[in-house]
Structures are given as structure tokens and as C-alpha cells.
Amino acid sequence: MPARASRPAPGLPARAGLGFKPEHYATLVEQPPDLGFFEIHAENYMVPGGPAHAQLAWLRERYAISVHGVGLSLGGHDPLDARLLAGHRQLQRRYAPDSISEHLAWSRHDGRYFNDLLPIVYDDAALRRVCAHIDQFQQCLGQPILLENPATYVRFEASHIDEAQFLCELVARTGCGLLLDVNNVYVSAVNHGFDARAYLARLPLAAVGEIHLAGHARQRDAHGRAVLIDSHDAPVDEAVWDLYEYTLALTGPVATLLERDGNIPPLAALLAETDRVAACLARGLALAA
């Protein structure tokens, strides 16, 4: 069995969680599920009031909460958006979430916003830039964040730092934690032809504070080659489940989120997947005992 990493200080409970969808709210109120936490996308709650906040307040009274940002563009060349920083700070003050996270990606350039999580060049300049942005975000919040590893579809010739090493450097230099998206690891490994398990072994696993699981789509590029897309619109693939169990053998039990952002089924279908997450975590806990 692989050597297991020591765990960071507790944040989210080491249980199964689910991304919150407003269309499930009535069902949740009628029969609250036995879950450890819910995750919300920060930008959907950067308004002063309304139904979204009423629903989030209900969740916060009953569950741990993870706030996941998608638009701060930590990897971009532009300065961080002051309005988004203020919005994150307001959410933190209002709900005291158990975890706050963002992506290793960029989505803003020259003041324009792109509705996507775009890849960065892994070089020394990018490392300094992302470190500075993480430091700024963490200083704004007064707490460490978790940074999510990306799913990628292209690589840059200018990159001279391995992605896993880049993440190690970010964690070491900023004190941030890692949000380990296992589906992203699998998608990138297939797309670029590297060994997913070897990649995991090079990560700073002691810094992992949350794991994400999601489904992906299979497409073909212009040359007919298979490409996996981190689509979040399908059940978790069996290969990703296998990689998740391998990951838990390295990390021990970690708070694990099931993501579903497209083709959203009834809540019961998602809870069947979170039950499988809980079973994996229970096996991991038994091994750790």
C-alpha cells in the first residue's frame, strides 16, 4: 500500500458533500440528507439578499459549507478584481464557511472576462504571479484558501515547470491548501498521456483539504483523437472512482464533493453517488484505524 500523507488541520468534515442546486432545495427541506457539507459557487451569492441567500442560510444552519470561487482569475496577468475580493470577504463574514477555494486558471485579460477556466504557462513568471495573487486573496480573507488543480486540453512549449511541482511550490510559498480534483487529474492524464498515479505521488498530499469528483465527456479533436472534457454533466466514470480509491489510500479520508453542473438529475440520483463516496471514505477510515 502507498505511504499515507499526514492530514492538515480540519476544515470540512471528512464526509461526502454535494454541490447545491436551487432546483433541489424543496426536496432538501422536505427530507434533509445525511451529508457532511454542501458547496456553493461564490459568484452566485454576491448580491445583498433574495432567495439565494435565504436558501444558503438554511443550509448553513444544518451543514458545513464550502465556498468555491470560479472567477477570480488567480492565474491571470490582470490585477485581481476588487469587487470580487470584496464579495468573497462579505460572504465569509456572513456565513463563516468551513472552506474557501479557487482555481489554478485565468479568466480575465485586459479587463475582459472570459466565461471559462483557461490554462496557464508553467514558468517562473507565472509562479511569482500566482503566488502574489494567492497571497492577496488570503490576506483579504485572513485565512488560507484551497487551490484546485486544473483539467487541461493543451500544453505550452514555454512551460518548463511540471504541473505537480508548480502546485507544490504554490503550497510551500503561500501556505494555501490543495483542492484535489480527481476527475481533473484523470482528464488531463488521458489528454496528455501521463500516468495519473505518478502525478498524484508528486503532489503535496498533506495539504489536501477537499477532493472533487465529477463526470466528464468524450469528444474528438480535429484529427480524430479522443479528448476528455471536464463537463460535470454525467455520473462519475468508473476509472475516476478507481483513481479516487487510490487517492484515499494516499491521503486517508478527506471531505469529498460530488459535482454536477449539467444534465442535473433528481436529487435521489446524486445521493446514490454520494452514498458511494461515503462507502469509499468508510473503507479508507477502516484502513486508517
Curated annotation (Swiss-Prot):
InterPro entries xrefs: MbnB/TglH/ChrH, Xyl_isomerase-like_sf
Superkingdom, natural source: Bacteria
One Pfam family named in its UniProt record: MbnB_TglH_ChrH
Family listed: Belongs to the UPF0276 family.
NCBIfam families cross-referenced by the UniProt entry: PRK05409.1
Protein name: UPF0276 protein BB1291
Organism of derivation: Bordetella bronchiseptica (strain ATCC BAA-588 / NCTC 13252 / RB50) (Alcaligenes bronchisepticus)
Biological classification of the source: Bacteria, Pseudomonadati, Pseudomonadota, Betaproteobacteria, Burkholderiales
